[in-house]
């Protein structure tokens, strides 16, 4: 079993990289790959860079060259559910682009022509993430829709527009739908797990960088817990 884990920023992969044993590193087209073992599981860790193009390029290289059995995308996101606070977790059941609009030609808002309107995460991986989250004390976890776009959501008008398009939305960020789209096209199971670094449309006296550190720590904890669950299930 080989796991692939993708994070966009150094803060989102640093904890996992530091835990990796037998680590080897290679940079391909600006994408930083680390291979080795995470808590006994063969793994490849990718720091892709921020945004959908970087995420899609990195995921394509990852799947083509390293052939993992599944993909976990980890990192931070902006929360949309009123019940969640900074540091809480969101696990994807579906992922969608929030900045794609080809509705003039009859497609659903967010749908790339020729592809599904939404990308469904692998049910077994979602369940493993859910079980792993339940083992982390003091954190809430929601399972639901995550939306992706190439912008940081700090414009209240944009927040309300996206909320209107996807009323059930749990979180927004900048890579997940691109990763999901590539995984779907390769036929590779995936799940997106994000810890909230901010709440869309809300202001805070604490800096984004401080929240990001908390979110990255919680997201990494969930990845490690999830690998333990997946490994246990594989041995049954």
Swiss-Prot record:
Q: Which GO terms describe its molecular function?
A: adenosylhomocysteine nucleosidase activity; methylthioadenosine nucleosidase activity
Q: Which Pfam families does the UniProt entry name for this protein?
A: PNP_UDP_1
Q: Which GO terms describe its cellular component?
A: cytosol
Can you state which reaction this protein catalyses?
A: S-adenosyl-L-homocysteine + H2O = S-(5-deoxy-D-ribos-5-yl)-L-homocysteine + adenine; S-methyl-5'-thioadenosine + H2O = 5-(methylsulfanyl)-D-ribose + adenine; 5'-deoxyadenosine + H2O = 5-deoxy-D-ribose + adenine
Active site residues per record: 12, 198
**Which EC class heads this enzyme's classification?**
hydrolase
Cite the annotated pathway: Amino-acid biosynthesis; L-methionine biosynthesis via salvage pathway; S-methyl-5-thio-alpha-D-ribose 1-phosphate from S-methyl-5'-thioadenosine (hydrolase route): step 1/2
- In short, the EC number is 3.2.2.9
What processes does the entry annotate via GO biological process terms?
Answer: L-methionine salvage from methylthioadenosine; L-methionine salvage from S-adenosylmethionine; nucleoside catabolic process
Keyword Membrane in annotation: no
Q: Which amino acid positions bind substrate, per UniProt?
A: 78, 153, 174-175
Q: Does NAD count among this protein's keywords?
A: no
- Alphabetized UniProt keyword annotations: Amino-acid biosynthesis, Hydrolase, Methionine biosynthesis
Family membership noted in the UniProt record: Belongs to the PNP/UDP phosphorylase family. MtnN subfamily.
Q: What PANTHER family does UniProt report for this protein, alphabetically?
A: 5'-METHYLTHIOADENOSINE/S-ADENOSYLHOMOCYSTEINE NUCLEOSIDASE, 5'-METHYLTHIOADENOSINE_S-ADENOSYLHOMOCYSTEINE NUCLEOSIDASE
Described by its record, this protein's role is as follows: Catalyzes the irreversible cleavage of the glycosidic bond in both 5'-methylthioadenosine (MTA) and S-adenosylhomocysteine (SAH/AdoHcy) to adenine and the corresponding thioribose, 5'-methylthioribose and S-ribosylhomocysteine, respectively. Also cleaves 5'-deoxyadenosine, a toxic by-product of radical S-adenosylmethionine (SAM) enzymes, into 5-deoxyribose and adenine.
Q: What is this protein called?
A: 5'-methylthioadenosine/S-adenosylhomocysteine nucleosidase
Recall the taxonomic lineage recorded for the source organism: Bacteria, Bacillati, Bacillota, Bacilli, Bacillales
């Amino acid at each position: 079993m080989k796991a692939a884990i993708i994070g966009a920023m150094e803060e989102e992969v640093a904890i996992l990289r530091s835990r990796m044993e037998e680590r080897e590193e290679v940079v391909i087209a600006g994408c930083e790959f680390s291979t080795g073992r995470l808590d006994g599981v063969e793994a490849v860790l990718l720091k892709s860079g921020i945004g959908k193009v970087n995420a899609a390029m990195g995921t394509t290289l990852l799947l083509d060259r390293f052939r993992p059995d599944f993909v976990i995308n980890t990192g931070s996101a902006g929360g949309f559910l009123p019940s969640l606070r900074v540091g809480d977790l969101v696990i994807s059941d579906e992922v969608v682009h929030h900045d794609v609009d080809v509705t003039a030609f009859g497609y659903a808002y967010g749908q790339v022509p020729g592809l599904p309107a939404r990308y469904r995460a692998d049910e077994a991986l979602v369940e493993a993430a859910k079980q792993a989250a339940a083992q982390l004390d003091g954190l809430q976890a929601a399972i639901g829709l995550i939306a992706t776009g190439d912008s940081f959501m700090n414009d209240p008008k944009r927040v309300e527009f996206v909320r209107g398009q996807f009323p059930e939305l749990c979180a927004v960020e900048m890579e997940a739908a691109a990763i999901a789209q590539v995984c779907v096209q390769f036929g590779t199971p995936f799940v997106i797990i994000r810890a909230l670094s901010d709440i869309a449309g809300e202001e805070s006296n604490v800096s984004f960088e401080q929240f990001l550190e908390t979110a990255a720590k919680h997201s990494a904890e969930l990845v490690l817990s999830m690998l333990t669950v997946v490994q246990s299930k594989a041995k049954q």
